Amino acid sequence: MAAITASMVAELRAKTDAPMMECKKALTEADGDLDKAEELLRVKLGNKASKAASRVTAEGVVASFIDGTTGVLVELNCETDFVSKNDDFLAFSAKVAELIAKQNPADVAALSALEIDGVSVEATRTALIGKIGENLTIRRFARYANGGKLVSYLHGTRIGVMVEFDGDEAAAKDVAMHVAAMKPVSLSAEQVPADLIAKERSIAEQKAAESGKPAEIVAKMVEGSVQKYLKEVSLFNQPFVKNDKQTVEQMLKAANTTVKGFTLFVVGEGIEKKQDDFAAEVAAQVAAAQKG
């Protein structure tokens, strides 16, 4: 059997980014053949990725990248908060954000086929799953390239905002922070998605119906509730978070600044997290032990 040297392990690790012990095992199994060991590792890491694929990824990071008038906000997910702070995962997130800005993929599938340092995004992601041991996914991204000015704001790594604007950068930055805090769903009341309005109207109708008041009064109550909701969730109508005596629209007018659009990503938003039942888990383990 060929001797496995430290330099061989280091070379294989450089090629695959796999853990040292995995590299040594692969080299031993391949009897020192680097190419064969690399192939074995690719298969093994791929198997790890396949096993991890069904696991829920509700943690993660939001990364941003701005180069002139091109900007990107991207959300990548992992399984635990611990891994969301992993240096390799954070570096991958930053590279993905920059790649989106430069290559303009149509969607996540198209992005996965692009290359980072000569290796496809998908292969890089798969290798990282093998190295870290958790499922990792690229969930969504937004890309701006309309010629407008851009600012981004990251609250830690869990909330990210990008704002497209004309005018004062400091005012736009304040808007980005406001969006992170108040989470509007649109610029104006007119732009609130119809499905959200319908949902709010349904809730208002149910509440108003319980009042027992005449139909015309109920109708006015419902309309009042809907209009209140529209003001609460539209950016321009919200009280400015740094001075609630004025709306965001009034603040922007005073700063001679126009906001053309924004994107808000909150890590894991809308993803149902797995709730572990510790007692049930222990009971299952005890039952399994008794069967054995």
Swiss-Prot record:
SUPFAM superfamilies: Elongation factor Ts (EF-Ts), dimerisation domain (SSF54713), UBA-like (SSF46934). The gene is tsf. It is found in: Cytoplasm. Associates with the EF-Tu.GDP complex and induces the exchange of GDP to GTP. It remains bound to the aminoacyl-tRNA.EF-Tu.GTP complex up to the GTP hydrolysis stage on the ribosome. Gene3D superfamilies: 1.10.286.20, DNA helicase RuvA subunit, C-terminal domain (1.10.8.10), Elongation factor Ts, dimerisation domain (3.30.479.20). Keywords: Cytoplasm, Elongation factor, Protein biosynthesis. One of its GO terms (cellular component) is cytoplasm. Belongs to the EF-Ts family. This is Elongation factor Ts. Its main location: cytoplasm. GO terms for molecular function: translation elongation factor activity. NCBIfam families: tsf (TIGR00116). HAMAP family: EF_Ts. Residues 80-83 are annotated as: Involved in Mg(2+) ion dislocation from EF-Tu.
